[in-house]
């Protein structure tokens, strides 16, 4: 299922989230199971199925990582359920540095400064990865698509690391 087609949006990494939300509400009005209360069981089941598809499409397109995974899947590169990691040595070294910095937060003289530095570092890195990803996603070349998949893997790692940083920050407030 091409969710971009479902929502009548161009296949692109950047999505107008207001337009997406408007189209989501519009689709929900047409497929919501309540509209089929007096319909046959088969029509009710179909309405439930369509509603689930619209909901999944909306969740996929509003999340940049899931959107990128969907774009790759449309081009035959399905990484949505994989466990493969990035084999980029420089990225692996950066991961280790970030993890060490996360562990230092509780012992740092100024943990809030360290947290701010990590947020800045994460944000800068995510911007670089996202810019590269946008370029690679428009390609039809298999090597570029595999490189795009690696960029998505990096973003997934960064999302997990961001959650860990938020937890560390919350722990300081407790």
Curated annotation (Swiss-Prot):
PROSITE patterns: DNAJ_2 (PS50076). GO terms for molecular function: ATPase activator activity; protein-folding chaperone binding. SUPFAM superfamilies: Chaperone J-domain (SSF46565), HSC20 (HSCB), C-terminal oligomerisation domain (SSF47144). GO terms for cellular component: iron-sulfur cluster transfer complex. SMART domains: DnaJ. Keywords: Chaperone. GO terms for biological process: [2Fe-2S] cluster assembly; protein complex oligomerization; protein folding. Interacts with HscA and stimulates its ATPase activity. Belongs to the HscB family. This is Co-chaperone protein HscB homolog. It comes from Shewanella amazonensis (strain ATCC BAA-1098 / SB2B).
């Amino acid at each position: 299922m091409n969710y971009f087609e479902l929502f009548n949006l161009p296949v692109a990494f950047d999505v107008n989230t207001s337009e997406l939300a408007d189209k989501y509400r519009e689709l929900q009005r047409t497929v919501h199971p309540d509209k089929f209360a007096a319909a046959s069981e088969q029509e009710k089941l179909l309405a439930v199925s369509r509603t689930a598809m619209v909901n999944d499409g909306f969740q996929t397109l509003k999340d940049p990582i899931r959107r990128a995974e969907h774009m790759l899947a449309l081009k035959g590169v399905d990484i949505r359920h994989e466990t493969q990691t990035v084999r980029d040595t420089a990225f692996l070294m950066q991961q280790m540095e970030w993890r060490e910095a996360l562990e230092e937060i509780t012992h740092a003289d100024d943990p809030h400064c360290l947290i701010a530095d990590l947020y800045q570092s994460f944000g800068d890195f995510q911007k670089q990865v996202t810019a590269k990803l946008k370029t690679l996603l428009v390609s039809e070349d298999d090597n570029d698509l595999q490189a795009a998949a690696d960029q998505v893997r990096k973003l997934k790692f960064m999302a997990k690391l961001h959650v860990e940083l938020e937890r560390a920050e919350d722990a300081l407030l407790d």
